[in-house]
Every structure is written in structure tokens, then in C-alpha cells.
């Protein structure tokens, strides 16, 4: 059952694959090159100002248009947004430097790296349910561009387009991402279970019921097969670069191999995103309370002294494996779906010893600080997997925080720790008034 509230608005994203003709492709590429040219002009002025120890004096897009006639064919709002976004990135970098973070200077953009430009208005979406071939997106200075039709939800068609970004992928495919203001839509949960999740490099996560992430082994085998193909293509490309007698023939072969490799990268990304979207929705639909550990993913990916028997490499950097799992994206999608289904998400403090405390008697085992110990053996007779035990303790602690449930197994050191963040999206009060203000 879906409930739609008129007063509250929400901004959602819609990504469409464009199908432009040859003339429209040239215009899209011209906009990309013009925005890249203006961006490089601002980078040059910024670096000069740093060397001369002065404030940068940026030219407006109108002045640049007067100096360079080829910029007059591009849409004015896209050129204006380049300066705005450039200033915003510098502002963010300054705030990071003030906090002590290491941030490098801005760099020039090449044709390979620069792949998107921005619209703020005048973009229109026309979708014909009866004849999908007549569906198009109107883009200023480009015209009506057809897109790869899929079943678009009615909330997107009735919403208001706020901003738009046109992007060219590394495989040469043009995509448009729209930010649309729509009415908030709430859905009802199927079950009201409570669950704790402990992340794992091998199984994605282990929950408080002892189950692992569903169908993750098949997804992981598919990703590994893609990764082997990518590695073989990378070796071929590197050999072509080193042994280049006939440069023209080699460049054509290299281009084909790089396109093939980039398509595999996109397939890997699509498999990951699709799995995480379905998994996060399933968890929020069947659980009321979700307990998680607040992980510092940036620190975990940089650690080189992490010896984990779950993975094949020992003592190496696990940044690649953590990046493949995409835990940060999973947490973002979990919060988005929790707002839709009205869940409660508790992030437990990362210093809480969830893997050291026995979930049955509460005795603390300091030997479990060593990550190589995968099973906890307690004097009470409890022999349990490390991740399963940690998930149970995370759930018990979160129930103590939210519902004030007392557990004797956690009373010894419970006062020392606190929940890092508790997100309550429950709508118990709002649902009582649905007959008055809800459709």
C-alpha cells in the first residue's frame, strides 16, 4: 500500500540513456568541449593567482564569449554553471584544508577525463505510453533527443525537473540524469522484525539470525569472472603500448580493447548497484529496526597491516575489495529506503566490542581482538562464529538504546559506550492522521 502526501516534497534522480543522431552527437560533444575549455581557463587563472600571491580574477562567461566566438553556439546557462561549480569545489577544498585534510590543487581537464556538463532549466521530458518511439527529452541548443525507453514511474512524469546533467561515458554512450521534485511516497512494511548486521569481506554481511547476504556468492563469482577478463585486457593494452612498431594499426586495436574493457567496467558497476538496491529494499521492507556498526571505511581501505583469513591476500591493502563491496552506497540506499518504509536505523559506536563479548553469558574475551580468530569459544559452552556473535550483540545494544530493554549479558560494560547515530524514520503519529491529510 502506497501513501502519497501532497505537502511534503522529495527530490529523486532519474537516469536515461540517450539515443542521439549524428548531428546531435556533434552538438553534445561541442558543449562538452566548450565547458572543458572554460574550466581550464579558470584553472589557469587560479594557479597564476597562487604563484603571484593574489586573489584570482575570474572572467564572466560573457567576456569569454566576446573573446572566443566558438563559445556563442553553446547554451549560456551551461557556461555560467562552470564558474559556479568551480568556486564551489574550491570552497569545499578550503574547508577540508582548514580541518587538516590533505587536498591537492585543481588540475586541467583533458578530453578523456571531462565527460559531463550541467543544465539548470528549460529541460523537458515527454513520455508517450502508447508509442514509446515518440518519447524524447528536450535539451536546449540540442533539440528533441530520443532515449532508451523503459517503464518510467508516473511520479517522475508529474514532477518538476530541477536540474539536469548530460554525461558521456567511457564507452561513448550518452546519458542524462534528471533531478525531479516529486511528492513523498510511503510504503507499508511486510514484517516488523529486528535485525543486526555485521559486515564481512567474504559474505557482505552476517545478520543476527545467522544468515548471510542472500545470493551474494553468485554475484561475487560473476564479479570475479568480469575482473579476470578486465585484468587480461589490461595486460594486452599495456603490451600494445610498449611494443608499438606500426603505431596506426596498434592505436586502432588499442581503442577497440579499451572500449571492450570499459564496457566490462560498466557491467561490474551495474551488477553491484542492482544487487545493493534490491538488498536494501528487502531489508527495510521486512524489518523495523536495523542495527549496524559505524565503520570508518576510508581508514579500513588504507590499512596495510590487516591480516584476514577470509581473503586470499595476507597483509595487503584491502581497498579494492572494500570498493567492490560498496558498503557506503549500501548505507546510503538503506537510509533512503528506511525513510520510505519508516524504519529505525542505529549506528553503534565503532569502539563497542561486539565481537569480544559472548552473546550468551556476557563474558569478554580479549583474545578476539585478533582478527584471525574466527570462532568464539566461551566457558559457558557457547561456540559461535565471530560475525554471528557480533551481529547479535549489535542488535541487543540497539534495542537497549531504542526500547530500553535490559540485557544481563551487556550490563557489565554498557555504560561506557553509546550509539553513534540513531535515525528514526517511524511514522506512528503521521499514520493516525492519514484520513485527514493523506490521499
Predicted regions and their residues:
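Gly/serine-rich nucleotide phosphate-binding loop at the start of the catalytic core
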Residues: 1-81
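Alpha-helix initiation and N-capping motif
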Residues: 25, 36, 40-43, 54-61, ...
